[in-house]
Amino acid sequence: MKLPSVASLLIRVYRTTGPVSHIQRIRHGAVLNKNYSSVSAVKNCTALLYRNHGEPSQVVQLESLDLPQVGAECVLVKMLAAPINPSDLNMLQGTYAILPELPAVGGNEGVAQVMEVGDKVKTLKVGDWVIPKDAGIGTWRTAAVLKADDLVTLPKDIPVLSAATLGVNPCTAYRMLTDFEELKAGDTVIQNAANSGVGQAVIQIAAAKGIHTINVIRDRPDLRQLSDRLTAMGATHVITEETLRRPEMKELFKSCPRPKLALNGVGGKSATELLRHLQSGGSLVTYGGMAKQPVTVPVSALIFKDVRVRGFWVTQWKRDNRHDDEALRHMLDELCILIRAGKLSAPICTQVQLQDFRKALENAMKPYVSTKQVFVM
Amino acid sequence: MKLPSVASLLIRVYRTTGPVSHIQRIRHGAVLNKNYSSVSAVKNCTALLYRNHGEPSQVVQLESLDLPQVGAECVLVKMLAAPINPSDLNMLQGTYAILPELPAVGGNEGVAQVMEVGDKVKTLKVGDWVIPKDAGIGTWRTAAVLKADDLVTLPKDIPVLSAATLGVNPCTAYRMLTDFEELKAGDTVIQNAANSGVGQAVIQIAAAKGIHTINVIRDRPDLRQLSDRLTAMGATHVITEETLRRPEMKELFKSCPRPKLALNGVGGKSATELLRHLQSGGSLVTYGGMAKQPVTVPVSALIFKDVRVRGFWVTQWKRDNRHDDEALRHMLDELCILIRAGKLSAPICTQVQLQDFRKALENAMKPYVSTKQVFVM
C-alpha cells in the first residue's frame, strides 16, 4: 500500500502553479522547489528526511528544503510541535502497513500554525492552529505548504503538547470506547499496554464517563510509581500481566462488573487473557501488537461466549470519514472539552529540538519508556 | 451451564397435574411417572438413556420409560426420526457447553408427530409434524409428552429425513449466511469442513442465492468422489486444506471475488488460512472446532484489514429469539421452500433402529464419515 492523498495532492497543486523540478521524488508531504521563486515570507524549511528504510536514528537526516508557492487552495504553516509515535518508527523501518515513496519527511502527527492562506481558502485564517486530518503529511519539519482541506483547526486555548498529540492516541482511545460497545457509567473496560499513549487516554476518557478501567502493565522496576500515576489519572485497577493470569482476578470483579470491552495493544497471551475476563457477547479490539504475536482465540469463547474480535486503526477511520467533517470535528471538540476541564492531559513528554533527532529516536525505541519524545520547533 | 427451559418446564407442568415421583431425577426432557395412571393411549416409551458421561456407545442404554399424563398445555408426540449430531456426542462425553442433569435421554434434534393435545393447546393439532425449538428435549425415544410452546410445526410434504435434520445444521448455515455479512448474488463465501452437515447446507443455500462457495475439505481416499458430490450440490470450487495454503489460490480468485465471509468448523491453521483469503472488512465466523485448536488471528489482519472474528451457536440464537416466533418461522419456511424445490437435500443418512444404537454411535464417532446416523422409530 502506498501513501495516497496528501502528498500527491500537493504535487498536483504545485504542478498547476509552476514548473516541475525534483519535487516529484519527494512524495511524503515534503514539497520543495529549488527553481521556483516564492512570494511567501518563508521560502524554505528544515526537515527530518529519510531516503531509505532501516534503523530510525540512522536513516533520518536533517535537511533544508525549499517550499513551493502557496497555491490558491493551500496554506503555509509553521510547525509548532510533533511527536514520535510507534507508527512513525515502523514507517522508518519499512514495516508499517502504509509507506510513503522515498525520500520522505518523517512524522505523521503534530500541531502547526497557519502563516499564510491561498486565495480560495475559506476554512482557515492566519494564526489558526491546525492538525492533519490524515497520516502522510511529514510533520517533523519547521514549515510546510499544505492543502487546506487536509487540515482541521484546534482551539488555541489548549496546551501545545496536548494539541500536538491529540490526533492519534486520544482519537484512537475515544473511538475504541465509542464504536464497539455501548458503554455507560458503571461498565468496565479492560486493557493491556495501559501505560501507552492510547492506554493513558483510555484511562482518562473512561474515568470522565464514569467507566471502570482494569489496566494491565508489564512488571518493571518502577512499578509502584507507574501504578500510582495511572491511578491518579483515574485508573480503577492497575495490575501486572502476571496478576491477569491468576485466579485472584475474581476478587477484582467483586468491585466492578466483568468488562464489556477489552482493548489490546499487545497480542499473544496477554490478548487471550483479556478475552478470558470478558462478559458474554463482549468485544476484544486490537489496535497494536507490541508482543509481535497473533491474537489466539479459543473456539469455545467464540461459539459459546459469543466474544467478538475486531481491530481498530485510526488512520482508516479518518479515511472512511474523510468527507464527514462533522464526525472528526465532534470528536476533537469533545476531547478539547476534557482537556480544558483538566480531565485529559498529554502524556508525559520530553521536548526535543529537531537537530537532536538522533537521541530522540533512540530514546523512542527503548522499552519501558514512560515519556513521549516530541519535537518542538 | 445447566440445560434450562424445556426439561424444567416439563417438570413444572407435571407437578401441576400429579404427584412427584422419581421423574425429578430425569431432567433431560425424559419425563416419566411410574405412579401415575395416564389417560393417554400411549403410556410409555422406549428411550436411549445415559446415567453417566463417557464413551457414547458405552454410557447409553435402551430403557422403557413411563410417560406422564398430557397436561393442558402439553402434547403427546410420537418421534419419527432423530439424528446423531456431533454436539449430541459431546453432551454424552460431558464436554459440551450445556449438559443436562443425569439421567437424561440423548439427542437434541428430530421430527415428531402429534398424537394427543392438551385442553389449552391452540398452536398444534393431532397429526402435525413438529420439531423442538430448543436443545434439551431428549429426542432419541419413541414418544414424549412435551410442552406445546417448546415445539414448532413443519409442513408434512417434505421428506422425513429433511425434517429430522432441519433444525440444527441447515438453520446454522442459514443464519451464518444471513446475520454477519450482507451477501448478494456474485459474492463469495469460503468454508472449511465443507463436507459436514452445516457445510453441505451452506453449499446448497448459497447456490440457491447465486453466491459462490469455495469449499475446503481434508485430503482422503475418496477425494474425487466427494468433490464431485459437493460440486453436484452447487459448490463453485472444492479444494483440499493443502491447496488452501498454496500460492495457486490466487488463480481461483480470477473466477470469483475474494470472500466477504469465511465459515470455520475446524479452527487452528485452517481458520487462519481462511482469514488470509478474506476481503478487507470481511468476517470469519466459527461454529465448530474439529481440529481442537484455537483460532489464531494475525494482529495486522485485525488492524489493517479490519477482519471481524465472530462465533455462532444456533442454540443461543434460538434462545435469544425464544419470544420471536416469526424469526424462527420465517427461516423454516424459507428452508422448506428450498427443500420442495429440490435445492436443499438432507445429508446422506444411514437409518438405524433405536436398538442398534451402539453401532450407530460408534459409526458417528468415526473420522471421514460422509453419512449421518439417523434413528428412525
Curated annotation (Swiss-Prot), chains A, B:
CDD domains: ETR. It holds the Pfam family ADH_zinc_N. GO terms for molecular function: enoyl-[acyl-carrier-protein] reductase (NADPH) activity. It catalyses: a 2,3-saturated acyl-[ACP] + NADP(+) = a (2E)-enoyl-[ACP] + NADPH + H(+). SMART domains: PKS_ER. The active site is at residue 96. Homodimer. This is Enoyl-[acyl-carrier-protein] reductase, mitochondrial. The gene is mecr.
